[in-house]
Amino acid sequence: MMTKHEEIQKGVIFPAGEKNEAYAQVFTGQSYLNMLVNDPEVSVGVGNVTFEPGCRNHWHVHTDGYQILLVTGGEGWYQEEGKPARRLRAGDVVVTHKGIKHWHGATKDSWFEHLAITSGNSEFLEPVTDEVYEGLENQ
């Protein structure tokens, strides 16, 4: 299978960062993380997250805050529980409010990158099953 958007593996606007070992247990596949704001006086996290093709995070909720995703490259998915998945491309913006169960990640044949601006804590839940993920390509 041909992989799309391979140029993203080096980063689009910001460098892709290191392998995301700290969160590897809540991802299916390989992701990379470059935290862009490391100021302890700033109450939001800002990170550049890069996903290899097929990589996605587990279902999760932001328990006491929110998350804004600014898509910078590639093709990916965003899905809230009980709703159809949304295909994401560069320029798309997603706002996830407190308590909404969701996941996001790359399509199976494309690299994907977004900036994640996150306030508060995240609670990671079960993985997105292969059955659910593979079914998205048919939407």
Where are each of the predicted segments found?
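A short, polar/proline- and glycine-enriched secondary-structure boundary/capping micro-motif
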Residues: L69-L70, R89-A90, L115, L125-P127, ...
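A short beta-strand-loop-beta hairpin characteristic of the jelly-roll/cupin
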Residues: R56, V61-A90, I100
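A short, N-terminal "cap"/entry segment at the start of jelly-roll beta-barrel domains
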Residues: M1-V44, F124-Q139
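Conserved hydrophobic/aromatic positions in well-ordered beta-strands
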Residues: N34, G47-V49, L69, L115
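A structure-centric signal for secondary-structure junctions around beta-strands
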Residues: S43-G45, G65, W111-F112
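Ligand-binding loop in jelly-roll beta-barrel domains
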Residues: P40, W77, A85, R89-A90, ...
